[in-house]
Amino acid sequence: MQRDLTVDEFLNYLYINVKELFTLKEKSFHFWRNSLISCSKTKNFLFVVVGDEVLVYDLKEISSDASEPEPCFYLHCPHEASSSRQGDINQDMPNVINNVRCELIGDLEYFITANDCGKVAIYDVQKLNREPIIYDVQHSAWGLAVSPLRILGISSNSHNVNLFHLSPEFKRFKEDYHSPWFRQETLVLEGHEHNIPCITFNSSGTLLLSGSIDRSLQIWDITSLSCLCKFYTKLSIWGVKFIDKNAFYHISILKHKPGSLIPAQQFGQSPWKPPIMSSSAFLLSHEEDFDDDAVFEGEYYVHIQDELPKTKVKNYFRTYLRQKPEELFIFTTKFSIVLCAYMGNSQIFPLVSSKNCFEEPITPRFQALHRINMIECIPELQSVVCASQSGQLTLLRLICTTKILNGNPIYVYSFVPHKIRLTHLVDAPLLGMSVCPLYPGEENPFKRFKIMLTVYTGKVISVEVQLSENLYDTSHIGNIPL
């Protein structure tokens, strides 16, 4: 006899180990940034931001007793502060870094920093002693993304997204009058009405998704520089991430009650209220007055049912599509995580949402800092990792299935949230999150990854995640013998 897979069985295929690596003492960290930690994908380097400086650690040199290691390298601010350029968060500290990322561009890896006066620095990870390439977007820079086409996207408090071409062929594009790059150093995507904390490219590099404090998402065509679709929510957007359809794990379902799935519908075609036009209006707005994107709840809502260990994975499927989506993506607000499908033709369909997929903050005072502004995808684990500034972490297991309805195929996508317990280690707000292979630069047949976190008190925490190979035994999926 066979039965459907339970959530406990599905999540137990993940091995998770949380530990403190070390604590940085007597360091001055800054609130209200995007992410202040990044780990290399090709070398054992860990980059930790302290103000306008980056400390580089060799992970091989970190001892097991959690003692503070010596940095193997320092990246000092490559430009002097100017009285004519002020920071948005702290006017007297314009060079404080807001966000950092390690990105592969072609065969090389680069470490990228974005600061509060709009300067963006790009370092060669293999040659950190070289002077970085500097770009300037004139306003506080936040979102960073690099496309497979070697386009660097930078979102900022200018309410725009700037694009820079990193390809060696840029000079040729710049001289081609048929190219949008003809005589241009940067291309600009205009359309948001407030600051843009997050951007992401799709896997082909042809689309860019941006999320703004003005409560809107926009999908852009990078070739035509046009907005293909605009989608409104009730709350400011703090995180966005395109997800490759191949990153979803296919679940075979033995039985499913008719009517337990509903057709996905379009929402967000018009603003919920007038857009926020100024920073002061944003600070005075009462986002808690909204039921946090309640339009995506009800049949769309995924509950974490800790008290029901025998819950079936199939119960996490909520909606279906009649056609394969062109793209899938996740966006986050203060409390909610929403999975959406982009169908082309200016159509976005929310598929499933959740806002109880984090453990409670260690102290209620951290609740004011709650915003889910850190998202990383781990396709090899069929997972997305989300972190909130208030000190919580969750791992979303991506799932999909196909069925036949009235003789036609339907396509179903969802996620199973998995809380990662941090309260025994996280005693202050999170300032950054990064994901890389457990052993960077080496083959990874056992699918072992580490999630690196930095905390306001200076703690650096490692969360090792490994997927059991047993999950790939088809006898476990929808065919578990009783």
UniProtKB/Swiss-Prot annotation:
SMART domains reported in the protein's UniProt record: WD40
UniProt KW keywords: Cytoplasm, Nucleus, Repeat, WD repeat
Main location: cytoplasm
Subcellular localization(s) per the UniProt record: Cytoplasm; Nucleus
Gene3D superfamilies: YVTN repeat-like/Quinoprotein amine dehydrogenase
Domain of life of the source: Eukaryota
SUPFAM superfamilies per the UniProt record, alphabetical: WD40 repeat-like (SSF50978)
Nuclease is among the record's keywords: no
An individual GO BP term: nonfunctional rRNA decay
The UniProt record lists the keyword Cytoplasm: yes
Residues in WD repeats: 92-133, 191-230
GO CC terms of this entry: cytoplasm; cytosol; nucleus
Protein name: Uncharacterized WD repeat-containing protein C27B12.05
Species this chain originates from: Schizosaccharomyces pombe (strain 972 / ATCC 24843) (Fission yeast)
